[in-house]
UniProtKB/Swiss-Prot annotation:
Originating organism: Arabidopsis thaliana (Mouse-ear cress)
Transmembrane spans: 96-116, 134-154, 165-185, 234-254, 261-281, 308-328, 358-378, 379-399, 414-434, 450-470, 483-503, 537-557
Localization, UniProt: Plastid, Chloroplast inner membrane
Protein name: Dicarboxylate transporter 2.1, chloroplastic
Region span, Disordered: 16-45, 71-92
Comp. bias intervals (Pro residues): 76-90
Main subcellular location: plastid
Protein role: Glutamate/malate translocator involved with DIT1 in primary ammonia assimilation and in the re-assimilation of ammonia generated by the photorespiratory pathway. Exports the end product of ammonia assimilation, glutamate, from plastids to the cytosol. The precursor for ammonia assimilation, 2-oxoglutarate, is imported from the cytosol by DIT1.
Keyword Transmembrane helix applies: yes
Stated family: Belongs to the SLC13A/DASS transporter (TC 2.A.47) family. DIT1 subfamily.
Tissue: Expressed in roots, rosette and cauline leaves, stems, flowers and siliques.
UniProt lineage: Eukaryota, Viridiplantae, Streptophyta, Embryophyta, Tracheophyta
Length: 563
């Protein structure tokens, strides 16, 4: 933006001077115009304009008028208005109150609470740093990655952890699988493959509003396992399609006409996104984080991609099939039929042209990656190696370049902050703090005489609805997943059942509010849904999902032998 502004400034200045000298230098003006029309300035030239002083070597200096002549016409002119005060600069650095509160949590635990029996001073000190880090994730005195880095620094400076121990999780296979998955998502957006797939479903199923919703839902479920970012799917593929269809039906954002079509499609896609993400291990970054944290507590799931899909398949598919219909009754659109939608989709597909070479490469690469994720254990190929093979193919064949990877800030940010949390969580386990906490929770639950199924339901509900306090699914996982899994295990809940149920809930609570996930902010920001409706429908659909997953999932997981 700065370069563009400076370029506009220089262009304006040039045109002013040229108009002044046109009478004297017509040939040079023509030369300048011809040069400008032939080669518009590139990004590099714009940047050079932003740092180089403006000079016009083809133009003679403007002759200076005498002070007497210049002042004459201004004698009767009104005085110039006083300059407007410059806006005060925005505050830099950490937010003071969240900073104080976040640090206070750790200081109080470290110095005001005595070290309990069964915990070493080193473990207690690490717990205080960890809790300050978690508090910072919630209160946000700084961006998540920056705050996690400060927590990492504190653990090393206080000699709580050695440098190698503090950075141990940066070599985690799961974390690097997450990073690479962000690059796959960029490939879907860059090639336009995701947009094309969704548009085909609109063409096939879009004759009615309900059919349109099912077409979008099924296309997201198809794309999800190879595009592990709900935010990228929402903002890069489905929201543009929904907005285009809505506007063509006369449904405008921030307008009474929004209820014609846009409001329903937004809510349906938003509520279905959680089930699409819960269906596949690689459909959302937080899924992989959950399994890594479970592994830190000794809960290891063999053949994770297949095990995850088998356990999620029945309840997730039923929810995906029911959600558009339920919302069609609870939050009905004013427009029931959309006969023009298939035509719009067909026109868009025609404009997109035939499937490009890069799209075919993307299809082949993702089919290879998903196949290796499914069969990797049999072939001896870890999931992260399968992802590395896929990314290497995309780089070699030019579908992605390294600048694409470098510009994917969310990937590198996740690597930084989650590696810190995973490393701290692992060291807390090694130092016996997690075992001590589990024993304490077990004693409390035993005193309440709760059976493990009752404790399971209570803890799952608490984990779900506490998300009203969070603005990030991955932040929620980092803050509470390990603690709640430890409580489940202490209450006698089978470890794999507890870990998977918590992970599935992590996807489902992403549709609770307008701030509960990245896709929530994307869809709410479109302007088609009023805030009270977001909260009301979020709570109602959360309850319905809990019933579907609780009832269907209970029998399905029993059939699969998870308990």
């Amino acid at each position: 933006m700065e370069s563009f502004a400076l370029h506009s400034l220089s262009t304006t200045a040039t045109s002013t001077l040229l108009s002044h000298h046109h009478h004297h230098h017509p040939s040079r003006l023509s030369l300048l115009r011809r040069t400008s029309s032939r080669s518009p300035p590139s990004t590099i030239s714009l940047r050079s304009l932003s740092v180089q002083p403006l000079s016009f070597p083809l133009l003679k200096p403007i002759p200076r008028f005498s002070t007497r002549i210049a002042a004459a016409p201004q004698d009767n002119a009104p005085p110039p208005p006083p300059p407007s005060p410059s806006p005060s600069p925005s505050p830099q650095g950490a937010k003071l109150i969240p900073l104080i509160l976040s640090i206070s949590v750790g200081l109080i635990l470290r110095f005001a609470v005595p070290v309990p029996e069964g915990v070493t001073p080193q473990g207690w000190q690490l717990l205080s740093i960890f809790l300050s880090t978690i508090a910072g994730l919630v209160l946000s005195p700084l961006p998540v990655g920056a705050w996690a880095f400060i927590g990492l620094t504190a653990s090393i400076v206080t000699k709580t952890l050695s440098f190698s121990a503090a950075f141990s999780a940066f070599t985690s296979e799961v974390i690097w699988l997450i990073v690479i998955s962000f690059f796959f998502a960029r490939g879907f957006v860059k090639t336009g493959l995701g947009d094309r797939i969704a548009t085909y479903f609109v063409k096939w199923l879009g004759k009615s509003t309900l059919g349109l919703s099912y077409g979008l839902t099924l296309s997201e479920a198809l794309i999800a396992p190879a595009m592990p970012s709900t935010t990228a799917r929402a903002g890069g593929i489905f929201l543009p399609i929904i907005k285009s269809l809505s506007l063509s039906a006369g449904s405008k954002p921030n307008d009474s006409s929004s209820r014609k079509l846009g409001s329903y499609l937004i809510q349906s896609q938003f509520q279905c996104a959680g089930n699409s993400s819960a269906l596949f291990l690689t459909a959302a970054a937080q899924n992989l984080l959950c399994l890594k944290l479970a592994e830190e507590l000794g809960v290891v799931i063999s053949n994770p991609w297949v095990s995850w899909f088998k356990a999620a398949s029945l309840p997730a598919i039923i929810s995906l099939l029911c959600t558009p219909l339920i919302l069609y009754k609870l939050y009905p659109p004013e427009t029931k039929d959309t006969p023009e939608a298939p035509g719009i989709a067909a026109t868009k597909l025609k404009q997109m042209g035939p499937v490009t070479k890069n799209e075919w490469i993307m299809v082949g690469t993702m089919l290879l990656a998903v196949t290796l994720w499914i069969c990797g254990e049999t072939l001896g190929i870890p999931s992260v190696v399968a992802a590395m093979i896929g990314l290497s193919i995309l780089l070699v064949l030019g579908v992605l370049n390294w600048d694409d990877c470098l510009s994917e800030k969310s990937a590198w940010d996740t690597l930084a902050w989650f590696a810190v949390l995973v490393g701290m969580a692992g060291q807390l386990t090694n130092l016996g703090v997690v075992t001590w906490m589990s024993d304490c929770v077990a004693k409390v639950l035993q005193s309440l005489s709760l059976s493990w199924p009752a404790a399971f339901g209570l803890l799952q509900a608490a984990y779900f609805f506490i998300h009203y306090l969070f603005a990030s699914q991955t932040g929620h996982v980092g803050a509470l997943f390990s603690a709640f899994l430890a409580m489940h295990i202490a209450a006698g809940v089978p470890g794999i059942l507890a870990a998977l149920a918590l992970a599935y809930n992590t996807n489902l609570f992403g549709a609770l509010t307008h701030y509960s996930s990245g896709q929530a902010a994307v869809y709410y920001g479109a302007g088609y849904v009023d805030l009270p409706d977001v909260f009301k429908i979020g709570f109602v659909m959360a309850t319905i999902n809990a019933i579907i997953w609780g009832v269907v999932g209970t029998f399905w997981w029993k059939f699969l032998g998870l308990y």
